[in-house]
Amino acid sequence: DTAFGAGGSPLETLERVFLAHVAFVARHPGVPRILYHELQRPAGAAAQVRLRTMVSGYRARLARLVGDAKAAGQLSGTLDADAAAVHLIGAVQGLVMQATLFGGERGMPQAARRTWALLLDGLRGGRG
């Protein structure tokens, strides 16, 4: 919530949220493991429902932020805000998986900055 409300342009906020998400996971590497474990429970389990609700809300907030950045001319006007939000979350999940496989939680913030540069190019639609 702090990263969302710290001010700045929509694109600056989006970057700050992405980097804050990765930094949180780097500081608390057990959290994703617990969440993934909860997803293995039978469909409809209370923890699974709460997790889905939480992630859906986060995805919606990201999509609104992407929409704001589009409206401000910071991102491509043809960008699908919902798909962009899914890919931003997926990028964090990919960084988590890499850190889990290779024990690199401490390197996650640096990897996130490199990943953000790559994502930003796609979000801008090749406009630079």
Positions of predicted regions on the chain:
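Amphipathic alpha-helical packing segments from all-alpha helical-bundle domains
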Residues: 27, 45-72, 82-86, 113
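Amphipathic C-terminal alpha-helical segment
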Residues: 23-27, 64, 68, 88-106, ...
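Secondary-structure edge/capping motif, primarily at the C-terminal ends of alpha-helices
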Residues: 3-4, 35, 39, 99-102
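Amphipathic alpha-helical segments used for helix-helix packing
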Residues: 26-46
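Short acidic, glycine/proline-rich loop/turn micro-motifs
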Residues: 1, 45-48, 79, 99-103
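Hydrophobic alpha-helical connector segments
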Residues: 1-31, 81, 85-88
